[in-house]
Each structure stands twice: as structure tokens, then as C-alpha cells.
Regions:
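Alpha-helical bundle segments that constitute or directly flank the non-heme di-iron/ferroxidase center
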Residues: 4-31, 79, 83, 87-110
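Conserved small/polar residues in nucleotide/adenosyl-binding loops
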Residues: 125-126
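Short hydrophobic helices that act as membrane-entry/anchoring signals
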Residues: 67, 71-78, 82
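Inter-helical turn/loop segments and adjacent helix faces that build the functional surface
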Residues: 30-38, 106-121
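Residue-level recognition of alpha-helical structural elements
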Residues: 6, 36, 62-66, 86-89, ...
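Conserved alpha-helical segments that form or flank metal/cofactor-binding pockets of metalloenzymes
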Residues: 37-71
Length: 127
């Protein structure tokens, strides 16, 4: 279970992981590049797993209320770079993942001295 003080973070995590799933769906909808397709399929599986984990931990009443918006925005974030090619796709993924890493590091820092949340901290390290 997620402590109350982390619920706002995990609501954001829920939105972000949903967006990530749809980024890869957007890429896969358009890209014909076999390396990009392989890369995107692998990452889609990983992001879908992260999303399932967050949905399991975060009570449904705290899930993002704008979930459909995050799906559309994620899809667009993957689809548009696909119009411009492999380098744009990788640059987009790098930018998104850099932001996510900073977001999760903020949560890890908050939890780092709280031994009772060690499992949650480990989860954030692997997301």
C-alpha cells in the first residue's frame, strides 16, 4: 500500500506510465523501421508491466482522473516523431525518460531514510 503522502506522486506515476504505454502504441502505429518496431515492442511490454504494478498498488479512487487525455497525449507523443524518423523517436524517448528518472529520483529521495518503505523504494528504482 502506498502511504498517503506519496499518493500525489503515484497519481502522477499512473498518468505517466499510461502515457508511456501509449507513446509506444503511437510509434508502432506508424513506424516501418524493424529496429524501432522491435525496440518499441520491448518497451511497450515493460511500460505495461509498470502500469499494472502501479494500478495494483494505487487504490482506484486515486487513479488519474484525466486518463483518457494521457492516452491521447501519449499516442501523439509517439506518433508525431514517427513521421520524422528514427532519430526523432529516440530523442523523444530520451527526453521523456530523463524527465521520468528525475521524477522517480525525487520520490526515492523522500523514501530513502524510511526503512518501512524499502520495498516501495526498490520498485521506484526498477521503474
Amino acid at each position: 500500500m502506498i502511504p498517503n503522502f506519496l499518493i500525489p506522486f503515484f497519481r502522477t506515476n499512473h498518468a505517466g506510465e499510461t502515457g508511456a504505454v501509449f507513446i509506444y502504441k503511437g510509434i508502432l502505429k506508424l513506424s516501418k523501421d524493424k529496429d524501432i518496431i522491435s525496440f518499441s515492442k520491448r518497451h511497450l511490454i515493460t511500460e505495461a508491466d509498470h502500469l499494472r504494478t502501479i494500478e495494483r498498488l494505487l487504490p482506484k479512487k486515486y487513479h488519474s482522473k484525466l486518463i483518457n487525455l494521457w492516452k491521447v497525449m501519449g499516442f501523439i507523443t509517439g506518433y508525431i516523431p514517427s513521421l520524422m524518423g528514427k532519430n526523432f523517436i529516440y530523442a523523444t524517448i530520451f527526453a521523456v525518460e530523463s524527465f521520468v528518472e528525475r521524477h522517480y529520483q525525487e520520490q526515492i529521495k523522500i523514501l530513502s531514510d524510511k526503512k518501512e518503505y524499502k520495498e516501495l523504494t526498490c520498485l521506484l528504482y526498477t521503474s
